[in-house]
Structure formats: structure tokens, C-alpha cells
UniProtKB/Swiss-Prot annotation:
HAMAP family recorded: IlvD
Function of the protein: Functions in the biosynthesis of branched-chain amino acids. Catalyzes the dehydration of (2R,3R)-2,3-dihydroxy-3-methylpentanoate (2,3-dihydroxy-3-methylvalerate) into 2-oxo-3-methylpentanoate (2-oxo-3-methylvalerate) and of (2R)-2,3-dihydroxy-3-methylbutanoate (2,3-dihydroxyisovalerate) into 2-oxo-3-methylbutanoate (2-oxoisovalerate), the penultimate precursor to L-isoleucine and L-valine, respectively.
Protein name, per record: Dihydroxy-acid dehydratase
Quaternary structure, from the entry: Homodimer.
Species whose genome carries this gene: Chlorobaculum tepidum (strain ATCC 49652 / DSM 12025 / NBRC 103806 / TLS) (Chlorobium tepidum)
Amino acid sequence: MRSDTIKKGFEKAPHRSLLKATGCVSTRDDFSKPFIGICNSFNELIPGHAHLQELGRIAKEAVREAGGVPFEFNTIGVCDGIAMGHVGMRYSLASRELIADSVETVVEAHRLDGLVCIPNCDKITPGMMMGALRTNVPVVFVSGGPMKAGHTPSGKTVDLISVFEAVGKCSTGEITEDELQTVEECGCPGCGSCSGMFTANSMNCLCEALGFALPGNGTILAADPRRNELVKAAAGRIIDLVKKEVRPRQILTRTSMLNAFALDLAMGGSTNTILHTLAIASEAELDFDFSELNDLSAKTPYICKVSPATTEVHIEDVDRAGGISAILKELSKVEGLLDLSAPTVTGKTLGENIASAEVLDRTVIRSVEEPYSTTGGLAVLYGNLAPNGAVVKTGAVSPAMMKHTGPAKVYDCQDDAIAGIMNGDVKSGDVVVIRYEGPRGGPGMPEMLSPTSAIIGRGLGDSVALITDGRFSGGSRGACVGHVSPEAADRGPIAAVQTGDMITIDIPARSMTVALDDETIRQRIEALPKFEPKIKKGYLARYARMVTSANTGAVLKNDF
């Protein structure tokens, strides 16, 4: 075992003495057992993580019962909702790399034999997965589970996005401050990851398709007693994985990546999933090109529409309808779409995991013969405005905005854009351009939930598009095109756009262009002053110097 490095031989007496002092090693026999890290992300700032301390306790008990010695440690975490719309959002994506580094550091420094990862919200799941793949010790994931949707006294179903959009409605006088207060009180009724198919839930669902989590991981509610049972079962699997030396790079293969992307497309997951899955692939040293998503989308039906794409369905409804296993079972009817022989941490193949699944509600999970769309709910757009690609959540775009041409309204930061939208500068037909908010320019590629919610709240969702080298919350909806690559800070064409330039977004054609010739774009970019970083010290300054483009997952450079 790896852990023998710190526990075997007379020269390791000091190490054993310290391990005994932790209270986790209680008998001499414990030194012959696998040492398992319980990588928790409990903290009291994130509603999706406030309950994870109890799940950690359950996981430790399960590991002991299975014959291992558990050691719990924590990672940091950022609540994207609380960080939204201010400087804190610049730290959100950047926190993913800190989490990956933290996992690597603890596992390698203490020679752990295996990991049980307990994430829940946006950057924590991919960060832990990146760290696990880097160390390549056996691992199983079990998330904290989704939040239940809220309900107003009148019976209307609401969630966090309802609150953000209500701010825009309040600013126009469509609703009163008292009505806004009602939505605020009801939008987030308890612990768990926010209740729609936002980034956190998207990633936790993808864990099932990737093979790293047990069935139910993505959809069983945080407050459901079945969540505790799932934690116990998942943690109980790790000893078998350690003994059989089943490593994460054996689980994460190119075909399991394609399985996950197919699920993502079928349920219209967050655009952030593309960013994170590319980063995960990078850690596993798998080649996966941004453009392949469109080829996969062409044969993947969009069969499960969840908030924010609709206000009628939330994650709890997906669970009631059969969960992720039911979606995958339905997708397996499309010849050649899924590799059902892919291995998983259950010890069974993906096909065996979903064999008994069935769709229990066709209003939530449609058949592949009658999908919402014959193509997937995410797409990559190319053109002279995004030579290296940009991402849009097609499943959350209204039919009226699938093709749109309009004049650019350019803002060099998110704050200016929010002000412009809220004070009425943005008009019907405009294409809002928010730039210098990419991985390097932001820095940290902040999410644009506040401006997209303001557009929706002010009644412009069917007439205004928004493009950015930043990214979007999984809760954003509308004609929102993000991850524009190259970013403005790297002098991509988005840096050349001026207010009034005509921009065409053609989602069916996977195209996004600005009505400028190549020479004009070149001349405008050459005339720009040298890009000056917004933050010059601390972690974000270091991050900005090392981060790569969104089309490669915004991972950090490893070639110095």
C-alpha cells in the first residue's frame, strides 16, 4: 500500500506516533489497513455545503466498517451565488485550481491509499476530480445533493434564478419590493445545491456518466434520507477499489468522457460543464477538442428540460422521473451514442448500472423519438468573432433568438454592462458585448448571471443577445454566448468590436460573426494599448499569468 511509506518499519516510529495522536488510528491493527482520505468541502458559507459535516461522519463510519482507516480533511469552496456581481466572482473559477492543488497536496504528503470525495457546488466537484486524477489514487465521489425547489404562498415554484430575475422585474416596476421580498424568502428553502440544472447539479449528474459516482448521485435531494444511504454505500466501495487497484485514469477514458458529454447535451447542462470537463480531460492526459461537441450534439437528442430552460421542472422532478440512470437508459436506444461497457466505481459497467432503470414520467424525460430537439442542448459557435470557439446553452434560448442580428453595445467590464442594462441604455435588438472578463482578463472569467437576469427581468429576453469572453452561471437563460476565444486580453477579435458594429448569431449554423473584414479587425487590434492586468498582486495576479484559454478548459500552464 502507498501508506506503508508512513507506517511500516522501525524508522517510521515518529510517523506512527503522530498518527496515533490524531485519534484516527486507535489500534496496532489499524496500521495494516488502507488509509482513506475523506475529502470534504463542508463550510457554512455555501448552502450546498452546510450539511456536509454529517455526510463526512457517515462516510468515515462506512470506511471503518469496510476495513479502512478514514482521515477527514477539507478543501475551500466558493458560493457562486453569493460571489455573483462583485469582485468575489473573480475568485470562483480560480478556486477550482486551488482545490485540485489541495487534494494533490494532502494525498501525496500523507501517502493516502484512496479517496472519498464529498463535493457539491460548482467548482468543488471538478476541482476534486482534477486533483484525484493527478494523484491517480482510487476514488469515489458522492455529492451533498440538490436543494428542493421553493414555493411562494401563492403556490408558484421558484428557485435562486427566480430571485435574480425578480431584481430586474422590481427595477422596472413590474413587481413591488414586497413581492421581491417574498421571492427572496422562498427561493432557497434549505441546504443543497441550487435546485435547477445549474453548474453544480450538472457536474454531479455527469459524475454518474463518467463512472465516478453511484446511481442517484446527481438527483437525490440533500434532505432525502436516501442521500445518507448513498453516502454510506459510496464510501463502502472505496476499500474494494483500493484492493483491486482500480484507479481513476482507468475509469475516466475517452469513451466515458463521450458518455458524459452525451448526457450533458441530452439534459441541457450548464455551459460551465464544458469548461470543467475539458480541464478534467487535461488532467487525465486525454485529447478532446472543443469542436467535437458539435459532432456529438448532432446525434444526441435533447430529452430532459430542467430549470432554467423551463420553470416547470427542477432536479427533484428528474429524480422522481427515474434520475440520471433513466436518461442514460433512454439515450442507450440511440445506436452508437453511449459506450455501455465503460467501467464505473460500482464494479459494474455503465450498462449494468442502468439496466433496471426506467422512465417514470414522460413529461420530465421524453423519449428519444419525441425529444425537445433532435440535437443537444449545448453548442460551440465559430466565426470571425470567435475563431477558437464560443459556447451557448441552446436549450435555454427562445426560438425567436436562435438567429439574431443586431448592433453591438460594448462594455469593457460586467459592472458597466449591468448599469447599462438597468438604466435602459440597452434596447430591443441589441447585442450586448461584455469583454475583458476572460480567464486572464477578468481575471478568473466571472459569471454573468446578474446581466442575463437583468435582461430577462426587464423583458428583453426575446430581443437582446449577450456575448462575452467571460462565462455564465448554469442558471443563465436566453441568447447568452460565452467563453469567446481568444479573449479580449489576448487580443482576440472581440477586442476589436465597437458599439454599433453589426453582429450575427446563427445558432443552427453554429456561427457567430461581426460585420468587419479581417483587415479592419487587425488594424483595430493593433491600435489598442497594451493590456494592463486589473489585479497586480495576490493569488489572482499569479492565476492571470498562468491561466490558459477557455477553449482548453482554462487550466493553468504547465510548460515553463
